[in-house]
Amino acid sequence: MKLVLAEKPSVAQSLAKVLGANKRCDGYLEGNGYVVSWCVGHLVELSQPEAYNETYAKWRLEDLPILPTAWMYQVSASTKKQFGILKDLMKREDVKSLVCATDAGREGELIFRLVYHQADCRKPFERLWISSMEDQAIRDGFAHLEPSTQYDALYEAALCRERADWIVGMNATRLFSCLYHQTLNVGRVMTPTLAMVVMRDAEIAAFVPKPFYTVQLGMDGITAASRRFDDKEDAQEVLAKCKESMKAMVKSMDRKEKTEHAPLLYDLTSLQRDANRILGFTAQQTLNYTQALYEKKLVTYPRTDSRYLTEDMKPMLPSLITQVAEKIGADAADWKADNGTELSVDGMCDSRKVSDHHAIIPTGTMCAADLAALPSGEKAILQLIAVRLLCAAAPNHRYAEDMIVLVCGGEEFTKKVRTVLYSGWKNIWQHFYPSKEKEQKPCGGPILYPNAMVSFSQAEIKEGKTTAPKHFTDVIHFESRQWKYSKCKGAG
């Protein structure tokens, strides 16, 4: 008999269904040589300081820092019953081994191991490591269970995170609470995050908007602008000179053909960023919706930092892409490449760039599911993931950018004109998420070439104001954190 421990009851039920453990018992399911149970999140947690020494029950500066040499754990008061069930199952004589089937990640590993050690279990266990809750993925996972020792380092990393949180939180909270005579919660992640928000708000509060001025020349389909002037009189002087002739000379025209590569597939952070920007969801909402979709077998594992798929997935992708496109109502003219060019999956598959889990994509189960029955938030996230899969397989977007430089009254005026050469993946994206900004099309204005003289019909001054930094939203906060991390990493 094997005891399988999942992280949540819903996951345990999915595993039990595939394994044939259909007999329902109090806190577990059993059958076909398996006992399947669940942990209900963190059943075991680090003990409070007073468990190490009664004197720590009172917060005093002289006791700091509190640095345990042997870490103590306790069973969470709200989950004692389920822990007791798991402990009894582990002690059953007919249970010869265990399967760690908690979420395939650092925290999932920690949840299982803490229960295992707190129950003083010595029986061998293996690891189920899957990226999809589809039935076939579960079968394949159980057919290829991995040695527990392969994930010892992952468990130790989770211990480091947990204990670092405890050391910083317990000591710093007591320190500042004693110093300021009020409870001030301090956390390893929470406090630096709060500091970033405070610093940004201070920047905004101290910001003083400053006016600036540009001179703009208008002609058939083109508006060219001067540099910014801080002094309005300088702009007025240039405007007066331009109005004397109402003509400008074309100094230069520089055309560059540019490419916007097809976007990578989503990892959790990039999905949260787009969901915030496009749908207005917070990071936590996006995670909750995606986790729910994962447990319903509609998308792959969400807590991933990889944006690629493994090479062995390549053969199944063309069929999946076609089914996904049909399921979400993508017209062939939108999701297939221009001029009948076939989609390519080569760019999204690179096993070297996949860490614990591959990128987030829809599953084959999604293609047969009743999506209309999904809650609106889950449905919106599922569409975002599905559309990104189609875009990632589509050709690059290509466009030409013309930089026009005019001279009038001794001042240069510039205008960028962008012309789409090949819509590529943007054809798909804009079908579902139309851009609020109108794409610039080739203008029907004057024929321009270097040294040509062109007449303009309008000359005016436009006034603007510098703007303060934006308040943090989830998406801006993500970018700020990644920038700070990259900066520190680059500093060596």
PLM segments and residue spans:
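Intrinsically disordered, low-complexity regulatory segments
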Residues: 1-162, 166, 441-445, 457-460
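Amphipathic alpha-helical segments of the small helical/lid subdomains adjacent to P-loop NTPase cores
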Residues: 157-187
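Acidic, turn-prone loop/beta-hairpin segments
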Residues: 341-373
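Extended, well-ordered alpha-helical scaffold/bundle regions in very large, multi-domain proteins
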Residues: 281-352
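A generic secondary-structure signal for well-formed alpha-helical elements
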Residues: 19, 23, 93, 118-123, ...
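Long, highly charged, low-complexity internal segments
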Residues: 35, 43-76, 88, 181-291, ...
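An acidic- and aromatic-residue-enriched active-site/binding cleft used to recognize and process polar
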Residues: 9-10, 39-41, 103-109, 130-133, ...
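Hydrophobic (often cysteine-bearing) scaffold residues that line and stabilize catalytic clefts
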Residues: 11, 107-111, 156, 160, ...
